């Protein structure tokens, strides 16, 4: 073999091997991403499996009501959380519709849009595009808290006895085995309905006055905010997700842009003493470790609180990212605005 040909052959082999290595690495990362979602979903539900599920009444987007207490004992329930901007959700939708068509007489299938950066205007066209025909709900956070939403998509299976049976993220053989198991479980004559839903928490509204607030940051620092005192400050709460800017860049660019805009603006505004800002992160696709990485990557100096149990999002009635809540020195909530509100840009400009 001539030296020149040998040289080109070696170069070709090197390039091919590099491409194979790159593909394998990318494929491994994709598998790890799915495995991470599966781990999060199972971890969130592990303490609930075997326990009674909530006897909730769910209203679909067409106005129908599904009373779970009337379903338990007769059929199992399959709840699937999803979002229009979620890439693996989109990938799983054909299979989701196939499950509904095949098993809808045997299992109560409920499609639950998380409501996070979604509304009726985004959900309806998505359902049509994906060809989804099962009952669909747009959550206000109630189902997410009751069923421990941590990832999108997330599967929740409830057996015929009305007990949590399975939590998952991936559409794999194990999930389908679990689905078949609850479907073919013997029907029970009697189910003890346990109201496992917590009483409705008070949700703060614009105009309400708070006496004080206390947080613990991801650095384990305590923040105590007392209102109505001489040294009280105006307070700004920013509800966000560490993935909002990069993950939504292509699938929900307006939301991604809003998250960047809010972060950059408040980073600048925090240098003044007019408002004391606190960032509060969602627990969906988030953890303390990821928030530390977010803080490092974006160089933000604002204190960050991880809402691990979702209670802060609940009591302030937040389900959109980003959402800004402003309180005066007396603790009165002066305004609450999210990316989906028409006055969002005006509020940002006025800060």
Task: Give, region by region, the residue ranges found by the protein language model.
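Boundary at the C-terminal end of the N-terminal hydrophobic targeting segment
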Residues: 26-28
């Amino acid at each position: 073999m001539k030296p020149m040909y040998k040289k080109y052959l070696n170069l070709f082999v090197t390039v091919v091997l590099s491409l194979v290595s790159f593909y394998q690495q990318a494929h491994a990362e994709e598998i790890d991403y799915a495995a991470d979602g599966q781990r999060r979903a199972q971890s969130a539900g592990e303490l609930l499996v075997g326990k009674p599920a909530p006897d909730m009444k769910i209203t679909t987007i067409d106005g129908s009501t599904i009373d779970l207490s009337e379903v338990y004992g007769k059929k199992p329930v399959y709840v699937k959380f999803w979002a229009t901007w979620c890439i693996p959700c989109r990938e799983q939708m054909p299979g989701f519709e196939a499950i509904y068509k095949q098993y809808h007489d045997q299992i109560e299938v409920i499609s639950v849009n998380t409501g996070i950066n979604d509304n009726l205007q985004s959900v309806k066209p998505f359902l049509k595009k994906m060809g989804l025909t099962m009952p669909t709900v747009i959550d206000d956070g109630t189902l997410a808290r009751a069923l421990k939403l941590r990832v999108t998509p997330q599967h929740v299976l409830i057996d015929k006895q009305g007990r949590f049976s399975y939590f998952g993220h991936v559409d794999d053989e194990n999930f389908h085995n679990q689905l078949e198991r609850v479907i073919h479980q013997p029907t029970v004559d009697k189910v003890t309905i346990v109201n496992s839903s917590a009483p409705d928490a008070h949700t703060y509204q614009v105009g309400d006055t708070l006496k004080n607030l206390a947080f613990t940051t991801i650095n384990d620092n305590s923040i105590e905010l007392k209102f109505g005192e001489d040294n009280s400050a105006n307070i700004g709460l920013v509800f966000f997700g560490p993935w909002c800017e990069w993950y939504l860049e292509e699938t929900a660019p307006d939301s991604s842009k809003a998250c960047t805009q809010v972060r950059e603006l408040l980073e600048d505004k925090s240098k003044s003493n007019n408002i004391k800002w606190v960032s509060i992160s969602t627990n969906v696709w988030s953890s303390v470790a990821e928030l530390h990485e977010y803080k490092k990557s974006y160089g933000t100096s604002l204190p960050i609180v991880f809402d691990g149990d979702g209670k802060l999002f609940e009591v302030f009635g937040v389900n959109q990212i980003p959402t800004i809540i402003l309180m005066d020195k007396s603790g009165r909530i002066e305004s609450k605005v999210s990316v989906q509100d028409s006055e969002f840009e005006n509020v940002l400009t006025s800060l």
